[in-house]
Amino acid sequence: MNLISIESSTDLCSVSSFKKGNLYNVIDLVDSKEHSKNLPHIILRAMNDFEDYSKIEAFAVSIGPGSFTSVRIALSIVKGLAFGLKNNIIPVSTLEAMNYSVNDKGIHYVSINSFKNKCFIQKFKGSVVLAPPFISNIEDIGNLDNRVYLYSNNSIEQNCHLISPSSISLAEYAIINYSRLVKKYNDDINPIYLSENEFVKINDNKSK
């Protein structure tokens, strides 16, 4: 599959191009305040890896949870491009894409340090989602009952395995789950937004 993959849920902005299902090029930038300025340019650079834009079959894009503003920017750009090219869109949960890069068949958590002392967390067993994502205090991560794979741009004292969002793992996850995730260019696609209503303390029953 030929596709463009965009990950913008954190301060890391990552765009990659895939040709026939294989990675061709990747561009990574770190500056969440500049996503609105940088994203259009690096997406265009990735698209220019194809001599003819008609060869691009789909756009894979992260839909959060994460930086809601950055996710909306990327999704808006992708919707516009897909509408013009009549391409499919593959919306992908950021935490599920990150989990794809984790080689852990047991029960574990994947987390993103989202803002201030809060983080988004989701529970998995191998590649299987065990529970919806929720918000909690990052200092409570140490109270979780299983391994935690975390992305954070802050110094974390907890015993976590550090990982990073990537347009590469997002694309690979999108390709494998294409038939389940794919949307038409004119379908309704919305970011995953978690509010304080989803805030859960780690030692609450909801987080188990």
Where on the chain are the PLM-derived regions?
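Oxyanion-binding and handling regions
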Residues: M1-N22, S36, I90-K208
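Short amphipathic
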Residues: N25-D28
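Residues at secondary-structure transition points
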Residues: V30-N38, F68, R72, P165
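Short, well-ordered amphipathic alpha-helical segments that serve as non-catalytic structural scaffolds
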Residues: H35-F50, L95
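Phosphate/pyrophosphate-binding loops at sites that engage ATP/ADP/AMP, CoA/4′-phosphopantetheine
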Residues: I43-A58, L144-D145
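Short, well-ordered alpha-helices that flank and scaffold nucleotide-derived cofactor binding pockets
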Residues: R45, K79, F83, Y100-S101, ...
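DPxDG-like acidic metal-binding loop motif
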Residues: A58-T94
